[in-house]
Amino acid sequence: DCAHQNQQEKTFIDLIITKQIDGMLLLGSRLPFDASIEEQRNLPPMVMANEFAPELELPTVHIDNLTAAFDAVNYLYEQGHKRIGCIAGPEEMPLCHYRLQGYVQALRRCGIMVDPQYIARGDFTFEAGSKAMQQLLDLPQPPTAVFCHSDVMALGALSQAKRQGLKVPEDLSIIGFDNIDLTQFCDPPLTTIAQPRYEIGREAMLLLLDQMQGQHVGSGSRLMDCELIIRGSTRALP
């Protein structure tokens, strides 16, 4: 809430003023307090990991979310799917914007019209994935495959599809995003996009240490490779 956010901002500012922070590794797409680009120059060194916010002009380590999403949707098309739905994350999150763009660009490249009804949104929770899946299943022509912006929402979608009597992947293919540990053990195991979380964290920390030691580190992206991991939640249409 607003009071909690204000307290958080005050805490960070106090730490900076008292020089208790030598550097900051940001895991979100915004600063924990308001600061202009000019004001940022007086802050401790900062590196952004996993997210991408070009307006902050920070060194950033992340994957190419657009290409990763494109590859996932293109894979579904190659498996014969043409009614491909998308369970997207929050509209205000940059990575969700890029993942949705990847979905849209893949459909267009494959000659499929983008139908807004096939795009549902959630907040990265299991419950949101379940609700979004039901929204897609209620369509006159529901999708035969769904690309989800997160594994947690994909697991919610998988659960809801089963509750509606659908078999995955026989009746519906589902792809997630992140390759969290649980995806290997759900039934069926989830096809997903794996991010190199350790490597992203390591590279971001090395960039931060370079800055803290007085080296110049330019702003902009350092892209890490990701991988589409094929498991049991997707199959080719007969």
Language-model features, listed with the residues they occupy:
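Short beta->alpha connector loops
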Residues: 3-6, 27-32, 152
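Bacterial carbohydrate/catabolite-sensing allosteric modules
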Residues: 11-18, 23, 33-35, 41-48, ...
